[in-house]
């Protein structure tokens, strides 16, 4: 697609209804690359567009611009006027009367402003970023470029790997040139020193190998801890968001040959496999049963035998995969390789939800003759709010005794009221288990001793009583072994705790001590901490939301809470991510914005060796920024009801304070989430601002993360109430700005953001927001999964009024909006299409028709099937342009004028 050059880049997209009355049509839009990046909940993150000077994320459309030099008059051009011929005298009288009304209104408004009460909100600008300095002469970004990778930063995938003899700073690299090996382990320091005696260890010379005439092409690889064997996955097929199946192989490094993981069933698909810390065995799950393959034998040991449709061993069911572990494994080896802990999940009582496929057949089965015309139905055990949950308990396998057992914990939650959210092996047969009640507001931390087969609860925290909040499931607890030589007399662990209204880092020692040493405190909150632990030097590394919530910086602190030190330059407003080597002597530092992202490997400050190597600089993006025109970004706060809320405003290039711009609000808004981030990101919002010429505003309202638990927890039991108020109040603030056209304000979101878009326009009733767009929205929280929903809403049985209030149900208010759009995939296994269908039924029952709808056959929550992802954003852009150009206003009073009547009369042979 040819790029646009020249012209005033602050112009809005020209109304498609002018000059021919052509309706904006998705079918003639963009030509997308087939390599569009994938979107899921991770997609939502990308759509949410981080915050920085980059730009587009979604739609690119049309080549015509127009200058928006004044407010759009619905009576001009091709809009349909009322009938009758103009009478000059009457016009003068009317105009004079209108002028009198305007002057009176302005005077009254001025008096009210001086003496009346003001809205309890204010704005304060903190940062303004504009990394594109081409002005109006730069090339405009297109929607194609947003999705074809043109603006995607290159990102090297470097994995740290522990050395077999305790070496630190080893990297696992995959996909290197054939001459250097396809899979190899390299010492980070020696790779810059040609004289070093530490040479790379080549694990796999080639990118494939043969087993009995079958070519095996690895999709994923896991070296054994001793680096002598590689566990290889091939023929991978996706299951749900994080899970997959495939064929597993064992590849011998010395001989460069492979064999099936299970020689007796090499073609059967395996759900999960993982190495023993001793490198002598692999545990795996197939058909929901667990097996053990010892490398000393070709025989496979059955650990469980009764797994099946309703009983899972070692792998999570749908809801635990999606809402608790965000992964495909619930299997944990003890560090000595003597025991395996795993979850047993019983779904017998969980109701099923049918997902239908009208075009494809995901199960791969050919229908019987006569059945070709029927859709394929996949039934998922999906616990909706208030429905029975899967029963989950922790089991253990004694490798030496070939025995499965469980351990009872006195005072623990009942089976039906328990969520197991984390399992961490300690030393000497001890296991740390974190669990919550069903509504996720009471936390139990238990310690189990597998030697004595006993367990006890060592910590209880009633989060609901503490601040009315909840426990977010996470898997970041880090075991800290005793080391008397370094001052650690007892085992312990590091966990994230609530301290003075924010998430902070704490160290518990001994392991059964309920009172911690708080390691961090203050205004900032830790993020998925800890990120790394240096046991030798007694240091914890972690990521923190910096001086402002949209930042991320790296810090370290001693185990005793002293010597809190920044690793990154905290004087700069930046966004970093990091991964640490096994011993935390080195860090893979990833700068994500606001400028062009880069990646470096560095030695950590406590390391005696000083090292730094740039891995990626993304020079191609720096060059592109010199050619293109992007939006400017304003990071600021607004105060609403006493809460200071982060806001990102994206302004079109060549922004003109004297013009009137339409405004699109974009949000996600889910509990604990964050959309206002200071990252380099060219996304759909960038496209809307930099190409279409609209302002885009994102507000992280109450309920979102990193603004304190008081603001976060206020939403509990009443999702959508405070969040929608924040969006409405923010829209009022922007509507009052001199450069905003208050008649053209819209809002859009996906998933939770779709729910928020609908809830906001429902609560606003057309007073501030005139338009709304919801993609894959929840419309009634009774239809969403139990673990997520009840965490924030309690159960429907306990909180029926809250569920009623949260549902999108006020059709009268929705009818007061000019128009809204709903899009949904029919095979969405996450937010079921039931949400949109029942919502549309409410609209039909109440004779509401000011909306559009688009369903995508066989698409899941990310909406990708058969070109659907392109169509989502093409449709979104088309619809938005038409909305802001008054297309839907024509339906308000569709009275034909005399020209239309004359044409109709001519067509039937009459004369007027």
From Swiss-Prot:
Glycosylation, residue list: 130, 210, 346, 569, 656, 810, 897
Catalytic activity: Release of an N-terminal dipeptide, Xaa-Yaa-|-Zaa-, from a polypeptide, preferentially when Yaa is Pro, provided Zaa is neither Pro nor hydroxyproline
Biased composition (Basic and acidic residues): 7-25, 54-67
Any Gene Ontology biological process: proteolysis
Segments on the Vacuolar side according to the record's topology features: 114-912
Cellular localization per UniProt: Vacuole membrane
Membrane-spanning parts: 93-113
GO CC, any one term: plasma membrane
PROSITE patterns: PRO_ENDOPEP_SER
Annotated catalytic residues: 751 (charge relay system), 828 (charge relay system), 861 (charge relay system)
GO molecular function: aminopeptidase activity; dipeptidyl-peptidase activity; serine-type endopeptidase activity
Enzyme Commission code(s) on record: 3.4.14.5
The keyword Glycoprotein is assigned to this record: yes
Keywords: Aminopeptidase, Glycoprotein, Hydrolase, Membrane, Protease, Serine protease, Signal-anchor, Transmembrane, Transmembrane helix, Vacuole
Topology of the protein relative to the lipid bilayer: Single-pass type II membrane protein
Region (Disordered) location: 1-29, 48-68
Family under the similarity heading: Belongs to the peptidase S9B family.
Summary of the function given for this chain in its UniProt record: Type IV dipeptidyl-peptidase which removes N-terminal dipeptides sequentially from polypeptides having unsubstituted N-termini provided that the penultimate residue is proline.
Name the record gives this protein: Probable dipeptidyl-aminopeptidase B
Organism listed in the record: Paracoccidioides brasiliensis (strain Pb03)
């Amino acid at each position: 697609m040819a790029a646009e050059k020249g012209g005033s880049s602050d112009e809005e997209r020209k109304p498609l209804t002018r000059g021919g009355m052509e309706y904006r049509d998705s079918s003639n839009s963009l030509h997308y690359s087939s390599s569009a990046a994938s979107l899921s909940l991770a997609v939502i993150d990308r759509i949410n567009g981080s915050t920085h000077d980059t730009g587009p994320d979604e739609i690119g459309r049309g080549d015509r611009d127009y200058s928006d030099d004044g407010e759009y008059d619905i009576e001009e051009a091709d809009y349909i006027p009322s009938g009758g011929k103009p009478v000059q005298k009457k016009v003068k009288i009317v105009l004079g009367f209108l002028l009198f009304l305007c002057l009176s209104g302005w005077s009254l408004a001025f008096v009210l402003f001086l003496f009346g009460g003001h809205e309890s909100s204010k704005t304060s600008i903190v940062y303004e970023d504009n990394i594109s300095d081409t002005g109006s002469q730069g090339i405009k970004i297109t929607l194609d470029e947003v999705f074809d990778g043109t603006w995607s930063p290159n990102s090297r995938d470097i994995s740290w790997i522990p050395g077999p003899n305790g070496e630190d700073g080893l990297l696992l690299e995959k996909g290197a040139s054939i001459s250097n090996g396809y899979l190899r382990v390299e010492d980070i320091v020696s790779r810059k020193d040609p004289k070093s005696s530490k040479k790379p260890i080549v694990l796999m010379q080639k990118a494939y190998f043969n087993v009995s005439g079958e070519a095996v092409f690895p999709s994923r690889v896991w070296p054994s801890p001793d680096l002598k064997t590689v566990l290889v996955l091939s023929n991978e097929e996706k299951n749900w968001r994080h899970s997959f199946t495939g064929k597993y192989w064992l590849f011998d490094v010395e001989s460069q040959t492979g064999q099936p993981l299970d020689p007796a069933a090499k073609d059967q698909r395996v759900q999960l496999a993982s190495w023993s810390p001793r490198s002598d065995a692999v545990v795996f799950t197939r058909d929901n049963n667990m097996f053990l393959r010892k490398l000393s034998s070709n025989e496979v040991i059955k650990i469980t035998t009764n797994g099946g449709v309703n009983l899972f061993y070692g792998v999570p069911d749908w809801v635990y995969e999606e809402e608790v572990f965000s992964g495909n494994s619930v299997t944990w080896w003890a560090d000595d390789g003597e025991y395996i802990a795993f979850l047993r999940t019983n779904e017998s009582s969980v109701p099923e939800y049918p997902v239908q496929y009208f075009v494809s057949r995901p199960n791969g089965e050919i229908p019987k003759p006569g059945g070709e015309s029927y859709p394929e139905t996949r039934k998922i055990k999906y616990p909706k709010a208030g429905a029975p949950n899967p029963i989950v308990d922790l089991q253990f396998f004694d490798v030496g005794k070939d025995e499965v057992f469980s351990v009872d914990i006195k005072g623990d939650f009942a089976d039906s009221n328990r969520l197991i959210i984390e399992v961490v092996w300690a030393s000497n047969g001890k296991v740390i288990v974190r669990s919550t009640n069903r509504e996720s507001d009471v936390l139990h931390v238990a310690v189990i001793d597998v030697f004595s087969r006993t367990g006890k609860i060592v910590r209880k925290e009633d989060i609901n009583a503490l601040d009315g909040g909840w426990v977010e499931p996470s898997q970041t607890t880090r075991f800290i072994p005793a080391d008397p030589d370094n001052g650690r007399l007892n085992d312990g662990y590091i966990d994230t705790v609530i301290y003075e209204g924010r998430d902070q880092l704490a160290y518990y020692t001994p392991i059964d001590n309920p009172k911690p040493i708080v390691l961090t405190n203050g205004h900032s909150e830790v993020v998925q901490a800890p990120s790394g632990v240096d046991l030798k030097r007694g240091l914890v590394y972690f990521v923190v939301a910096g001086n402002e919530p949209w930042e991320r910086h790296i810090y370290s602190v001693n185990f005793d809470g002293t010597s809190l030190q920044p690793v990154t330059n905290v004087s700069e407003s930046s966004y970093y991510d990091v991964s640490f080597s096994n011993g935390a002597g080195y860090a893979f530092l990833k700068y994500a914005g606001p400028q062009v992202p880069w990646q470096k490997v560095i030695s950590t400050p406590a390391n005696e060796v000083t090292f730094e190597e740039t891995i990626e600089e993304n020079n191609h993006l720096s060059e592109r920024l010199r050619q293109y025109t992007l939006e400017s970004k304003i990071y600021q706060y607004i105060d609403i009801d006493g809460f200071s809320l982060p806001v990102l405003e994206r302004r079109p290039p060549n922004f003109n304070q004297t013009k009137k711009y339409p405004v699109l609000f974009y949000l996600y808004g889910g509990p604990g989430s964050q959309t206002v981030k200071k990252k380099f990101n060219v996304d759909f919002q960038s496209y809307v601002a930099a190409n279409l010429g609209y302002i885009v505003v994102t507000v992280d309202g109450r309920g979102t993360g990193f603004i304190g638990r008081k603001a976060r927890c206020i939403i509990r039991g009443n999702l959508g109430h405070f969040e929608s108020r924040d969006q409405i109040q923010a829209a009022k603030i922007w509507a009052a700005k001199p450069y905003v056209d208050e008649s053209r304000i819209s809002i859009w979101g996906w998933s939770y953001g779709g729910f928020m878009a609908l809830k906001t326009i429902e609560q606003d009733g057309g007073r501030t927001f005139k338009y709304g767009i919801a993609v894959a929205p929840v419309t009634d929280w009774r239809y969403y999964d139990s673990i997520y929903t009840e965490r924030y809403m309690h159960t429907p049985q306990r909180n029926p009024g809250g569920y009623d209030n949260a549902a999108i149900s006020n059709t009268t208010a929705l009818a007061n909006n000019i128009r809204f759009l709903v899009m949904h995939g029919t095979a969405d296994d996450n937010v079921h299409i039931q949400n949109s269908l029942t919502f549309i039924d409410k609209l039909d029952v109440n004779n509401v028709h000011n909306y559009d709808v688009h369903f995508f056959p066989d698409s899941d929550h990310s909406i990708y099937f058969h070109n659907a992802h392109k169509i989502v954003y093409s449709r979104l852009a088309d619809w938005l342009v038409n909305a802001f150009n008054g297309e839907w206003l024509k339906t308000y009073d569709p009275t034909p004028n005399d020209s239309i009547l004359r044409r109709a009369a001519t067509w039937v042979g009459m004369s007027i």
